[in-house]
Amino acid sequence: MQIFLKTEDEINLMRKANQLVGATLAELGKHIKPGVTTLHLDRVAEEFIRDQGAIPTFKNFPNPYGEPFPASICTSINDVVVHGIPSEKDVLKDGDIISIDCGTLLEGFNGDSCYTFAVGEITSDVQQLLKVTKESLYLGIEQAVAGKHLGDIGYAVQTHCQQYGYGVVRELTGHGIGRAMHEDPPVRNYGSRGSGILLKEGMCLAIEPMITMGDRQIGLLPDKWSIVTRDRQPAAHFEHTIVVRKGKAEILSSFVEVEHLEGQKI
């Protein structure tokens, strides 16, 4: 395992890439409503990212099981946990939830963040799933400080979500991030206190709880990208890119614009 500690200059570049991801998610939030296709959202995202002089990292991202990813964002609706492919056939409906995962490459460094949006009015049980998943993200981030261990992050996410009876997906993880979108180490959403590698200042991590309302078992659709819950219950996904610091992690990405647009914090 090769982990790259970032310099302050590199962190500054990563901050710019991640701020662009946050701005892109906020721009997409303006378009999320019943009747909109996920293909439209993808076109909005790609234009917005390229207009800022950046590259949408996910476009043509390689797939060990099939064709490269064909779009600029992942649009995962309801029971799709991650990697949903934008399509003109996927039309948002009132009561849906959609997780939009976005990555940018700017000045040689990557940004990565995901937000699960409500489409119109959603049920109270789905609202709680979103709330708890987002809470677990920040509880995990609280553990991402120098001197703690990688397992402390996963333990915080897992214990919070499981007390509500939710499933914590095991096969998918967060990751290190920097010049490459996916670097070491993998950041699991489960674990035990004090386990795993020691966290050091300058590590940049994408922490991303992927939480299911029902069973944690998942499956791969024939498109070789979309991963769904086997029981077809909804899933939520929130992600921030952070840098490990002494005392308190620094969050490089941002939900501020998205939450301002929503008018409330989930």
Predicted features and spans:
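Active-site neighborhoods and metal-handling regions in enzymes and metal-associated proteins
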Residues: 1-266
